[in-house]
């Protein structure tokens, strides 16, 4: 591998020249011409000069190599004359060795495509423009948010006072309806019953509006939860709308066995409500109560349930008419009053 030319193309390695062209013993001032290294440029040949005049021993020969220069490069160097000093030779050899090493490295290392210049061409200049980056605009400090104005407390409007409850007016008792005359059905011929001895009257809790002379004592005064009998709606022996004989419980042919009074409702008693209930009912052939109908209720539906519950437990003796047990209708008036303590 031959070294590439550098900025000093006339300097080469002395060692390479010595190996390729060994020197011969000098005789007098004779010199041996070497082939021209820079023959392409037309530079003069190198000469190896034998310094025989300065040797002390015949066996030792000192050879000096003169580094050629281009014609007219240095006016002081004259071809054929010895060098000025020895240090110039050593320094030139060192420089040549460094140049050769650098040239070898440059040859081996790949060069960029831009730097592959032709012979005698100058490297192209590269223009570099420095751009100054704009500084980021600092965010402008925002003014502190104004504190929200305190909202005035809402003034609560005074709530209107609830209206006072109106006092409950006691219902006025309705006038008793006049009993309508019942059309008598066609009377059928009935066999006359055999006369029986009259039984002794049993004390009862009912009494008619007009006390009968047969009763031994007047009925007890009404108390809370007790009832008093009502007036007759039809005379004894008459028939009701269903074709059954009707009358009042005061009739002698109606004999009760069990008559529990109704219970006074707690709500009505607590409010001091009094009233009355009139019912029409049927006494079956086995002495039970059936078909209870409310004819009058004051206040409306206040005591109806208690009356029905009490009458469901009533029992009567079967009524015999013409040798047969028959059913009949009857009416009853219940009064609900509160005893006042003295």
From Swiss-Prot:
Keywords: Cell inner membrane, Cell membrane, Membrane, Protein transport, Repeat, Transmembrane, Transmembrane helix, Transport. Residues 157-203 are annotated as: 18 X 2 approximate repeats of [KE]-P. The keyword Membrane applies. Gene3D superfamilies: TonB. InterPro entries: TonB, TonB-dependent_transducer, TonB/TolA_C, TonB_C. One of its GO terms (biological process) is single-species biofilm formation. The chain crosses the membrane at residues 88-108. GO terms for cellular component: outer membrane-bounded periplasmic space; plasma membrane protein complex. Residues 109-342 are periplasmic. Sequence repeats lie at residues 157-158, 159-160, 161-162, 164-165, 166-167, 168-169, 170-171, 172-173, 174-175, 176-177, 178-179, 180-181, 190-191, 192-193, 194-195, 196-197, 198-199, 202-203. Residues 154-172, 191-201 have a biased composition (Basic and acidic residues). It is found in: Cell inner membrane. Residues 224-239 have a biased composition (Polar residues). One of its GO terms (molecular function) is energy transducer activity. It is a single-pass membrane protein. Residues 204-215 have a biased composition (Low complexity). Residues 1-39, 136-260 are annotated as: Disordered. Residues 1-87 are cytoplasmic. It holds the Pfam family TonB_C. Homodimer. Forms a complex with the accessory proteins ExbB and ExbD. Interacts with outer membrane receptor proteins that carry out high-affinity binding and energy dependent uptake into the periplasmic space of specific substrates. It could act to transduce energy from the cytoplasmic membrane to specific energy-requiring processes in the outer membrane, resulting in the release into the periplasm of ligands bound by these outer membrane proteins. PANTHER family: PROTEIN TONB, PROTEIN TONB-RELATED. This is Protein TonB.
């Amino acid at each position: 591998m031959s070294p590439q030319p550098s900025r000093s193309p006339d300097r080469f390695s002395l060692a390479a020249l010595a190996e390729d062209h060994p020197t011969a013993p000098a005789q007098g001032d004779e010199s041996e011409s070497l082939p021209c290294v820079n023959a392409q440029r037309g530079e003069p040949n190198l000469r190896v000069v034998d310094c025989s005049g300065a040797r002390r021993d015949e066996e030792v020969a000192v050879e000096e190599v003169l580094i050629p220069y281009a014609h007219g490069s240095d006016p002081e160097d004259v071809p054929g004359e010895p060098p000025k000093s020895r240090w110039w030779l050593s320094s030139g050899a060192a420089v040549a060795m460094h140049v050769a090493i650098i040239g070898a490295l440059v040859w081996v290392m790949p060069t960029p495509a831009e730097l592959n210049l032709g012979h005698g061409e100058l490297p192209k200049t590269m223009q570099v423009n420095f751009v100054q980056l704009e500084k980021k605009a600092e965010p402008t400090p925002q003014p502190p948010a104004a504190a929200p104005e305190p909202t005035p407390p809402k003034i609560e409007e005074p709530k209107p006072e609830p209206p006072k409850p109106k006092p409950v007016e006691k219902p006025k008792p309705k006038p008793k309806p006049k009993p309508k005359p019942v059309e008598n059905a066609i009377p059928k011929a009935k066999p006359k019953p055999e006369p029986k001895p009259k039984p002794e009257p049993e004390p009862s809790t009912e009494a008619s509006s007009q006390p009968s002379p047969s009763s031994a004592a007047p009925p007890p005064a009404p108390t809370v939860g007790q009832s008093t009998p009502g007036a007759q709606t039809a005379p004894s022996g008459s028939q009701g709308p269903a074709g059954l004989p009707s009358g009042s419980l005061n009739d002698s042919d109606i004999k009760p066995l069990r008559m529990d009074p109704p219970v006074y409702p707690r709500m009505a008693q607590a409010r001091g409500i009094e009233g009355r209930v009139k019912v029409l009912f049927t006494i079956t052939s086995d002495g039970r109560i059936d078909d209870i109908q409310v004819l009058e209720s004051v206040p409306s539906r206040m005591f109806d349930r208690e009356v029905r519950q009490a009458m469901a437990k009533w029992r009567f003796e079967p009524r015999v008419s013409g040798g047969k047990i028959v059913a009949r209708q009857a009416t009853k008036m219940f009064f609900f009053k509160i005893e006042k303590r003295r």
